[in-house]
Amino acid sequence: MQTNRIEQLSVPANTVLHGDCISIMRSLPANSIDFILTDPPYLVRYQDREGRSIQNDSNTDWLIPAFTGAYRVLKQDHFMISFYGWTQIDKFIHSWRSAGFRIVGHLVFRKQYASKSRFLRYQHEQAYLLA
């Protein structure tokens, strides 16, 4: 596997890192990551038909530490795409901006299925392009 040597740490090239993002990013050197794609908990207290839920989907404590860590490890003039929960967009935007990110684009993806809601059928996912 090809690696890039940065500040005595080795960052694997073309690698997906899976785990607790705050812990993983603490171990990475600043300005070492080319691109971040994140689909974090949406803060909507999601529960599926079988009653399963998503960890930290009602807890906002991780927002600012996670996005501050992402900003620290992302190389200057590179991008992060972050999905978000539209009902909590104010919290996501505040966290992104507090970390130092600029919003430079908005992406909308059509889904093949509809999410349950009270008034509308949600058939799309959204993400922001951040720099």
Tell what function each PLM region has.
Residues Q2-A131:
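Core catalytic lobe of class I
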